[in-house]
A protein has these predicted regions:
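Short, low-complexity disordered leader/linker segments with a strong preference
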Residues: 1-33, 58-62, 88
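Beta-alpha junction/loop-to-helix N-cap segments that form part of ligand/metal-binding clefts
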Residues: 68-130, 224-239, 243, 248
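Hydrophobic alpha-helical segments within soluble ligand-binding/sensing domains
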Residues: 122-164, 263-284
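Pocket-lining segment of extracytoplasmic ligand-binding domains
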Residues: 174-249
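Hinge/cleft segment of the Venus flytrap/periplasmic-binding protein
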Residues: 278-325
Length: 325
């Protein structure tokens, strides 16, 4: 009788332990696993990542989501390594922050949903010829494109005496190439001459900036991650040379520019996070979800640079808060 009771108790305890193990697995498996690939570290991309994380954790609950953030430090091969690791880990969704991260993620998986942000032109990034606003594959997301015709008009508005505009960008970034081509078309149609200066990486930024400052009246820089990570190199040359820089986004403008048509990277990150929630929680299909663009645009300027260059800024521009040196 004693032995029987002991066996029953032992079996009962085993069942409880096994149940606890499976309950633990169940709780762990119920978490949504998201891998974030950020192409490189600079203010705009950092804000987009922050917005995404805030939106996801607020909607799903921090206890119900496991987010792994990896930064590729501007290296496309590292983007690919991170993407492949996320696929091997079996994440539920990949957030790709910027073009290189998106391209690496798309190459790594055709089944795991990918939500991108800080990508200027998805058709260019994904090589989609017939663009309809949706990708038709496992990719959706938000764009950081501010209207390029308005950016071209800003150059003429702030620098009315300029005759030659220099466009600086990294030739390795497809979205920068796209922006540069469109802005060049707009500037040419406005009667301005355009010189194009490209770099392969950050090591060439100083040399192309020096050349541009000797040959143009104003510089335009699109949303370019390579230059965004090294704006000091541009500022140290363009500032003393007295050449104004009009930037495609606020982070670059803070670093070396006079003015920009600004979007909020935090906001496009938030919207990307909301799209991720729609996919994870409601089963939305990324292949049919419209790529979304920022709707709130603000003309912004850096007061100290505008003053130093003698540029009169219209009243509809908002001053960018400058950090004290």
């Amino acid at each position: 009788m004693n032995k029987t009771i002991k066996k029953v108790l032992a079996l009962g305890l085993s069942a409880v332990l096994v149940g606890s193990v499976f309950a633990g697995c169940s709780a762990q498996d119920s978490k949504y696993r998201i891998g974030i690939i950020q192409s490189q570290q600079h203010a705009a991309l950092d804000e987009a990542t922050r917005g995404f994380q805030d939106a996801v954790t607020q909607a799903l609950g921090a206890e119900n989501v496991e987010i792994t953030l990896q930064n590729a430090s501007g290296d496309s091969a590292t983007c690919a390594t991170i993407a492949n690791q996320f696929v091997a880990d079996g994440v539920d969704l990949i957030m790709a922050n910027a073009t290189a991260a998106l391209q690496a993620s798309m190459q790594a998986t055709a089944s795991i949903p990918i939500v991108a942000t800080s990508v200027t032109d998805y058709a260019t990034a994904l090589e989609i010829a017939d663009w309809t606003g949706v990708t038709g594959i496992n990719v959706t997301g938000t764009s950081d494109l501010a209207p390029l015709d308005q950016q071209a008009a800003m150059i003429q508005e702030l620098c009315p005496d300029a005759q030659t505009v220099g466009i600086l960008y990294c030739s390795a970034e497809p979205n920068s190439v796209y922006q540069a081509n469109v802005v060049e078309e707009n500037l040419t149609s406005m009667g301005l001459a355009v010189n194009v200066y490209t770099c392969a990486d950050t090591n060439e930024i100083a040399s192309i900036t020096t050349q541009a400052c000797q040959e143009v009246d104003v510089i335009y820089i699109p949303t370019d991650n390579t230059i965004a990570s090294a704006t000091a190199a541009v500022d140290q040359i363009a500032g003393p040379a007295g050449i104004p820089v009009i930037a495609g986004e606020e982070g670059i403008c803070k670093g070396c520019g006079v003015a920009t048509l600004s979007i909020s990277y935090y906001d496009i990150g938030v919207r990307a996070g909301e799209m991720a929630v729609e996919i994870l929680q409601n089963g939305a299909d990324p292949s049919t979800m419209q790529i979304e663009t920022a709707t709130d645009l603000t003309k912004k300027y850096v007061p100290s640079r505008a003053q130093a260059l003698g540029i009169t800024v219209p009243s509809d521009y908002v001053a960018i808060e400058e950090t004290a040196e």
